[in-house]
Amino acid sequence: NQVCSDVTDNQCTPYPVILQLMSQANRSMRGGLCEGLAVLSLRLAGDITALAAFQNTKTVAELIKEDPALLSEIAYWYVTQFAMEVQEEASSYLAMSPKDLAEVLLYDFAEAEKGNPYTGFTIGIYSDQGGHAVTPYRVEEMAGGYRIYIYDSNWPTEERWIDVSSDGQWMYALAATNPTEQSEAWSGGVGTMELTPMRSRSGPFTCSFCPQESGEKSGTMVTVAASGSKQMALKIVTDTGQRLGYYDGKFVNEIPGATYRYLISGPSTADPVLVFLPPEVETFSADVEE
């Protein structure tokens, strides 16, 4: 009901902002589906019944990607990153040090091994080359930091990892958003690595920037995307001086309830930026930067 301006004979006429999001989602998916693959692989991990229901295979790597049901499932989990509930959770982790993120994963895996309730996370990493989503499955403490072992859908049969130093820097030495491209090292610090908990992707989802039936004010969505491969960024400043975005190379979010997310796509196009501002923010400036 939130996304439809009219429903006639069970046919939805979406609000213009929803059509814009759908167009953005389709454009992003043309660049790559790593987000959907990272989520689905985690959902299927250890669940032989669910895995067999797709194509009667024993491992994710054996799945035939041309299967329509599988493609639909991948696309669904890909677009969950557009949901406000997902963005709110991811934004809170984006503001944390990579060292703290590694420790969150270490604790979560320890709880899983004990048979206790655990969360499950996907990882998003960002660099000048683009964004990429991977699935962590183990963390080891090392001298000077941590090593996060990951499933990278571009290299499904190879062991990959992200090293995180005690001073909050990370490096993925074998990173490439496209398996046909030569791998090179990616690295970063606070604001370039995030965790997204699986619980946030379960729904139901809400549309805080859609017209509200209750008459309450709606939030504001701001998005920017480049036509080439150069990453763009948004700098938001409210009329009271609160900031959101990257300032002097560091991620800043001084606006309660606001979210900032790069929509992970692939190497051929820049990752679009999607910003949500709560209804309380009525006046603001938005500057686009490379």
Segments from the language model and where they lie:
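Short, flexible beta-strand-to-coil junctions
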Residues: 125-130, 153-156, 224-229, 288-290
